[in-house]
Amino acid sequence: MSRTDRNAADLKSAVSTALAKVIDPELQRPITELGMVKNIDIEPGGNVQVGIYLTIASCPKKSEISKRVTKAIADVPGTAAVEVSLDVMSDEQRTKLRKKLRGDAREPMIPFAQPNSLTRVYTVASGKGGVGKSTVTVNLATAIAARGLAVGVLDADIHGHSIPRMMGSNQRPIQLESMILPPIVHEVKVISIGQFTEGNTPVIWRGPMLHRALQQFLSDVYWGDLDVLMLDLPPGTGDIAISVAQLIPNAEILVVTTPQLAAAEVAERAGSIALQTRQRIVGVVENMSGLMMPDGSRLQVFGEGGGQQVAERLSRAVGTDVPLLGQIPLDPALVAAGDSGIPIVLNASDSPVGKELLRIADGLSSRQRRLAGVSLGLDPSRR
């Protein structure tokens, strides 16, 4: 082998090593591990031509993938111009990829319901609509993701879905054979029935269809290794709440209420479902907890004491401490942030609302799933 050939081989090896550090923005795995590198060609002078496979031709992240590949190669000493060409996986390659990601199981399983799952699952519930449950969900999820954790949001409010709008996303999921790849928005994986409907078309489904949709979102969607999954439930204790308890029995309930005592009574019923489903209540969040005035005082527009009342009554009902995790002030900026699709924890984190949401998120993200029933891979017979 000539010195030129040897140099080219060394450079190709270095480029391959660099590509192993390029993470696919949707699958969150190295592109080399996913079989996405088609070819690496080294030309005289250090010019590099690399071919990359996309899962589908209309991949919404193809520009991002191309940029990441180009940058990774350009940082390799000895490389000159970089040319990236994109191709599309064959059906056989997609099947191989799906098996690598999900295994060869004929029936997809719900990963979060498995005994060895370390994902913390929070179901955000409320007794009635209009208390800001979805607003709390998107802000807590985004705040936790900003802390570096892998987070997913499942919009389980099939009839009243609003998560895509509040996250500022109109992306559609990618279908990879029988597997669904959710869009990633603000570093959060998001799935909603609203991503599959046209315009503002209503979803007119009854119980069995709702259960099946939820089951598919949990099993057919490739969530990857999540630290936290948040489900935005519809108000009340209907079909979806029951299905969640059946499909993910380890899910913990986060109750959202307003300070109004009448609303608190309804929220208490939403939390009391834990008595029947044997789920754990992680805590209560009081939203719209007074309007901050210019002089620093707080105007109690919707009364006061509702959140504390729910926490105390649920504590007595379940026999364990149910804390009041936080009280989020009433702020028009929070509404505007939801309409704009940029959660307030991202664009106004120093505001009273932003600070309180971040404080609640810190409490939830610092809690680890209990290891009861989880195999640690230890064999006491081995020394």
From Swiss-Prot:
Family according to the record: In the N-terminal section; belongs to the MIP18 family. In the C-terminal section; belongs to the Mrp/NBP35 ATP-binding proteins family.
GO molecular function: 4 iron, 4 sulfur cluster binding; ATP binding; ATP hydrolysis activity; ATP-dependent FeS chaperone activity; metal ion binding
Species: Mycobacterium leprae (strain TN)
Residues making up the signal peptide according to the UniProt record: none
Metal-binding found in the keyword field: yes
Record function comment: Binds and transfers iron-sulfur (Fe-S) clusters to target apoproteins. Can hydrolyze ATP.
Chain residues that bind ATP: 127-134
Oligomer and partners: Homodimer.
GO BP term (any one): iron-sulfur cluster assembly
Keyword vocabulary terms for this entry: ATP-binding, Hydrolase, Iron, Iron-sulfur, Metal-binding, Nucleotide-binding
Entry protein name: Iron-sulfur cluster carrier protein
Encoding gene (name): mrp
PROSITE patterns from the UniProt entry: MRP
InterPro entries per record: FSCA_dom_sf, MIP18-like, Mrp-like_CS, Mrp/NBP35_ATP-bd, NUBPL-like, P-loop_NTPase, YlxH/NBP35
